[in-house]
């Protein structure tokens, strides 16, 4: 059984084709801007322009045609409204033209679900990206959000700070390299509130200290990462303690950061739980995770009538009943 998935919640358009155990194609194109940030209209235009060539590329890579696809899945939300609507329109058009069932997928859930292709059973997930920062796990038939950012996503915080330092966009990899040269920890605000996190105070103070000219930029980069990542690891560990689950996964674009991986791995080893990070192309926003989650949903008897394929910009993770 094969599923085609279309991802387009933000600045990346991704199209993936998967079977139950294998990724046959996973292609994407990311809108980049000189100043950074994403304008929803520009993202929508980017997705509309590249939808057809990317679909062709995915089918060619998988060595199949649309006739071979069993179900079409698309990212229903959360995300940027105009971008989501382009994706949903394309998915509906394909479903109608080729007479295929269609499934809307929650983007955040898909990030965790794709780890199950690699034998992960029931993890606590730390999902870290530009716009999202969540600790989630399956409890009572739904993905419960145990902790999340109260203001900005960790990826956005990193990008804004990197931009302030003149590193350009995306800033994550460049900030990480700079942080590796840092030697002295500089005190920065650490904000964990219950199980939730806040990064705005950390970002504001890091920028203030940088502008003061009194601190080495390498030390500031190092301290920024250490402070933010320690908070992420703390709330993830609390969720593990609460749920008593034996697996923890790291997903989302910021999962590329080696220091965050290292800190989570140490915590997991201390607790005696399995730690897993998918290959990076399945960590970042991608169509394969949408296809895989959609396939699992479809196999459990879920498909959407067209009138239920409306996009949800603020699609909460715990809205979805997990029956697959």
Swiss-Prot record:
Residues binding Fe cation:
107, 111, 127, 285
Alphabetically list the UniProt keywords: Acyltransferase, Cytoplasm, Iron, Metal-binding, Transferase, tRNA processing
Identify the cofactor(s): Fe(2+)
GO MF terms here are:
iron ion binding; N(6)-L-threonylcarbamoyladenine synthase activity
| Highest taxon listed in the record's lineage | Archaea
According to its UniProt entry, one GO biological process term is:
tRNA threonylcarbamoyladenosine modification
Subcellular location as annotated? Cytoplasm
- What are the record's GO terms for cellular component? cytoplasm; EKC/KEOPS complex
Quote the PROSITE patterns the UniProt record gives.
GLYCOPROTEASE
Q: How does it assemble?
A: Monomer. Component of the KEOPS complex that consists of Kae1, Bud32, Cgi121 and Pcc1; the whole complex dimerizes.
What is the protein name stated in its UniProt record? tRNA N6-adenosine threonylcarbamoyltransferase
Species the sequence originates in = Pyrococcus horikoshii (strain ATCC 700860 / DSM 12428 / JCM 9974 / NBRC 100139 / OT-3)
Q: Which gene encodes it?
A: kae1
């Amino acid at each position: 059984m094969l599923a085609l998935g279309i991802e387009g919640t933000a600045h990346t358009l991704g199209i993936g084709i998967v079977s139950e155990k294998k990724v046959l194609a996973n292609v994407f194109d990311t809108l980049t801007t000189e100043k950074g940030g994403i304008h929803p209209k520009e993202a929508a235009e980017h997705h509309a322009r590249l939808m057809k060539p990317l679909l062709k590329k995915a089918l060619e890579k998988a060595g199949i045609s649309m006739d071979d696809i069993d179900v079409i899945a698309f990212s229903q939300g959360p995300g940027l409204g105009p971008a989501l609507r382009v994706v949903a329109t394309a998915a509906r058009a394909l479903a109608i033209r080729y007479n295929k069932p269609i499934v809307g997928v929650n983007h955040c859930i898909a990030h965790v679900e794709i780890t199950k292709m690699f034998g992960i059973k029931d993890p606590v997930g730390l999902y870290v990206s530009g716009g999202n920062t969540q600790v989630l796990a399956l409890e009572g038939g739904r993905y419960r959000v145990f902790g999340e950012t109260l203001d900005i996503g960790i990826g956005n915080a990193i990008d804004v700070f990197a931009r302030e330092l003149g590193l350009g966009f995306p800033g994550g990899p460049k900030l990480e390299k700079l942080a590796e040269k840092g030697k002295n920890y500089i005190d920065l605000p650490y904000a964990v509130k219950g199980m939730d996190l806040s990064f705005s105070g950390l970002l504001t103070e890091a920028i203030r200290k940088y502008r003061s000219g009194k601190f080495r930029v390498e030390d500031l980069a190092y301290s920024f990462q250490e402070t933010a990542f320690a908070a992420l690891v703390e709330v993830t560990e609390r969720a593990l303690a609460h749920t008593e689950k034996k697996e923890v996964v790291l997903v989302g674009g910021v999962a590329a950061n080696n220091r965050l991986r290292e800190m989570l791995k140490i915590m997991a080893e201390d607790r005696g739980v399995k730690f897993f990070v998918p290959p990076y192309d399945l960590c970042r926003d991608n169509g394969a995770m949408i296809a895989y989650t959609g396939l699992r949903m479809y196999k459990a008897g879920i498909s959407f009538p067209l009138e239920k394929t409306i996009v949800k910009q603020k699609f909460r993770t715990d809205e979805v009943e997990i029956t697959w």
